[in-house]
Amino acid sequence: MKKIFLDLDGTLAKFNVRNALQRFETEKGFFAKLGAYKGIEKINEMAKNGNVYIISASPNEQADSDKMKWIEKYLNNVPIENRLICRCGDNKAEFLKTKGIKIDKNCYLLDDYTKNLVEWEEVGGVGIKRITKVADNSRKLWKGLEVKNLGNLAIVVA
């Protein structure tokens, strides 16, 4: 069965790193207040079959809590055990290994950060670059799959 792993900030949630770096350190509830990109309801619908996971990097416990609130608001069909938070800078594939999840060719990661996608593919998964107006400028370095509209994700992983 295919498993779909989704990054949060900049991929599903409207997060502009250039405008947010100082705010999330001081503004309580910052991550919980982020808006969602168009098409989030299709992702929530996909999650009903239990094979959708959230894997988000977080700087601290307050942000962990905020992100869980965001997930509950927009992606309440994602099973609680599939809502995973690692630390900023962690290799997401390595983190999942510590949770007993092995990445293989049936594991897809949708992320806006090319480094995460490269690390994912190095262990046998399939990376999908999320294209947004604020996606990192390493897009030109990414040669794999891309998704601009969240509603098209189901087509890409079919």
Segment roles from a protein language model:
Residues 3, 85-115, 120:
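Conserved Lys-Pro-Asp/Glu-containing loop-to-beta segment of HAD-superfamily phosphomonoesterases
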Residues 22-54, 61-65:
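Short, acidic loop-to-helix structural element flanking the phosphoryl-transfer center
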Residues 55-60, 68, 74-94:
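A short, structured active-site edge motif that brings together acidic residues
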Residues 94-102, 140-158:
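Short amphipathic alpha-helix with an adjacent loop that forms part of the alpha/beta core around
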